[in-house]
């Protein structure tokens, strides 16, 4: 909609109008470091807002995917809430190995005053048998996913044991 495509401050809209405002932030290689999406209902989505939520294109400083790093509401100072996502990332600049990127945890809620988070959902993975590892290339870069989701645990932060654990497989 405005600004120079791919640079900090550029403003975008969705192809089918949703009345969301998308703003590019910072710079990483040949594009933005992150994006902020503000929706008409007051939610603010941050993509690539943390190092672990940026998926790099091989050894390049250019990002090939921006994962959701935070969701927050637009409430006034001191009253807003947020959900924070963290990732296991083997596609970070300077440490590109398998090119894989997978969710590690989701923490919630965090308030605008910094209180919390109080709860966390943790994701645990195991290594797949070598014969079952999907391998491919994306934009000329190796992408192997040797991991499979093994367990999901819901935790009160600071508690010794999870509230609930789901074993998969």
Model region roles, listed by residue range:
Residues 1-169:
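Conserved catalytic cores of ATP-dependent inositol ring kinases
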């Amino acid at each position: 909609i405005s600004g120079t495509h791919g640079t900090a401050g550029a403003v975008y809209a969705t192809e089918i109008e949703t009345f969301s405002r998308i703003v590019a932030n910072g710079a990483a290689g040949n594009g933005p470091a992150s994006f902020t999406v503000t929706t008409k209902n007051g939610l603010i989505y941050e993509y690539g807002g943390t190092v672990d939520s940026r998926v790099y294109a091989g050894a390049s400083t250019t990002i090939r995917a921006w994962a959701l790093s935070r969701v927050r509401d637009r409430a006034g100072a001191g009253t807003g809430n947020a959900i924070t996502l963290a990732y296991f990332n083997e596609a970070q600049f300077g440490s590109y190995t398998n090119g894989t990127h997978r969710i590690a945890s989701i923490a919630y809620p965090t308030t605008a005053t910094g209180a919390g988070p109080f709860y966390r959902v943790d994701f645990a993975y195991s290594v797949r048998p070598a014969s079952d590892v999907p391998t491919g290339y994306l934009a000329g870069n190796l992408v192997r996913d040797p991991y499979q989701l093994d367990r999901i645990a819901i935790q009160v932060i600071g508690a010794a044991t999870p509230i609930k654990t789901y074993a998969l497989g």
